[in-house]
């Protein structure tokens, strides 16, 4: 998922996506623990997607407070 796509989503949609990604990350970590995970790079991708979503949410919070200068 690209940041541009995330920015087009509403804040509620982003929060729902974060919850979905966290659940996927939990499942991936479980699979890794039982040696059943084939694509270990997916863990990194999911963690990065969560971080990108949270960053966009935080940017919106700061913008609403008027603290973003850019």
Curated annotation (Swiss-Prot):
Q: Which GO terms describe its biological process?
A: translation
Q: Which InterPro entries match?
A: Ribosomal_protein_uL29, Ribosomal_uL29, Ribosomal_uL29_sf
The answer on whether this UniProt entry bears the keyword Transmembrane helix reads: no
Q: Which GO terms describe its cellular component?
A: cytosolic large ribosomal subunit
Instruction: Tell me one GO molecular function of this protein.
Output: structural constituent of ribosome
Iron keyword on record: no
Going by the UniProt record, its keywords in alphabetical order are:
Ribonucleoprotein, Ribosomal protein
**Any Pfam family hit:** Ribosomal_L29
* Family stated for the protein in its record: Belongs to the universal ribosomal protein uL29 family.
Record's protein name = Large ribosomal subunit protein uL29
């Amino acid at each position: 998922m690209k940041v541009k796509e995330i920015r087009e989503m509403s804040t509620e949609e982003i929060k729902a996506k974060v919850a979905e990604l966290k659940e996927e990350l939990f499942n991936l970590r479980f699979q890794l623990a039982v040696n059943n995970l084939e694509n270990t790079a997916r863990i990194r991708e999911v963690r990065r997607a969560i971080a990108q979503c949270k960053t966009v949410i935080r940017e919106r919070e700061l913008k609403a407070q008027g603290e973003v200068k850019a």
